[in-house]
UniProtKB/Swiss-Prot annotation:
InterPro entries to which the protein is assigned, alphabetical: G3P_acylTferase_PlsY
TM ranges: 3-23, 51-71, 74-94, 116-136, 140-160, 164-178
Gene expressing this chain: plsY
Gene Ontology terms for molecular function: acyl-phosphate glycerol-3-phosphate acyltransferase activity
Similarity section: Belongs to the PlsY family.
Enzyme Commission number, as recorded: 2.3.1.275
GO biological process: phospholipid biosynthetic process
Protein name as it appears in the record: Glycerol-3-phosphate acyltransferase
Length: 203
């Protein structure tokens, strides 16, 4: 019962869309109405408000970290509990019950989850994102590369035997890549927006 309640709680935590909440609180347009229409930090940055983008990034990462940390802190379900909380909070961000299941792509939330699973895992994945983003200026490309490497880092650090968290990390990576399928098409066509590119007037 504890595992079930923790999993549901993690999903509800993940369902808090900071892109929408922060934008509304700061009097900005709903991020689902412009740019990529994705309620995430990168799209909020297209509004031109860096503070809102940073708050969105921190909030989305924090909720991922919090959901997993709470399960670890109170020892709910061991590794299985951690794995379920990780998947649940991630799915909450992708399909938030509070926002008609119209969620983001999960990059920041996944980063928070990985930091809670193990700081080295989270930092290694975040560093991968930063390196790719710095050199290529595409948030989506950085996310895709980081998603590919996250399970590899996890296996390298912890192995695969009796490790449900490794499967959770792999599942998040697959889901994140799937959520970026339109970005993959745009990258291949040379039409993807770069980091910091503002929304077009009238969009």
């Amino acid at each position: 019962m504890q595992i079930l309640l923790a999993t549901v709680a993690a999903y509800l935590i993940g369902s808090v869309s900071f892109a929408v909440v922060v934008s509304a609180a700061m009097g900005l347009a709903d991020p689902r109405s412009y740019g990529s229409k994705n309620p995430g930090a990168t799209n909020v940055l297209r509004s031109g408000n860096k503070k809102a983008a940073i708050l969105t990034l921190v909030g989305d990462a924090f909720k991922g970290w919090l959901a997993v940390w709470l399960v670890k802190r109170f020892g709910i379900g061991g590794e299985i509990g951690v794995a379920l909380a990780a998947i649940a909070v991630f799915l909450g961000h992708l399909h938030p019950v509070f926002f008609r299941f119209q969620g983001g792509k999960g990059v920041a939330t996944a980063a928070g989850v990985l930091l809670a699973v193990h700081p080295v895992l989270g930092l290694a994945t975040a560093l991968t994102w930063l390196i790719v983003a710095f050199f290529f200026r595409y948030s989506s490309l950085a996310a895709l590369v980081a998603a590919v490497f996250a399970p590899i880092f996890d296996v390298f650090l912890f192995g695969t035997h009796d490790n449900p968290v490794a499967w959770a990390v792999l599942a998040m990576s697959v889901l994140l890549i799937w959520r970026h399928r339109s970005n993959i098409s745009k990258l291949l066509a040379g039409e993807e927006s770069r980091i910091g590119q503002k929304k077009k007037t009238g969009v």
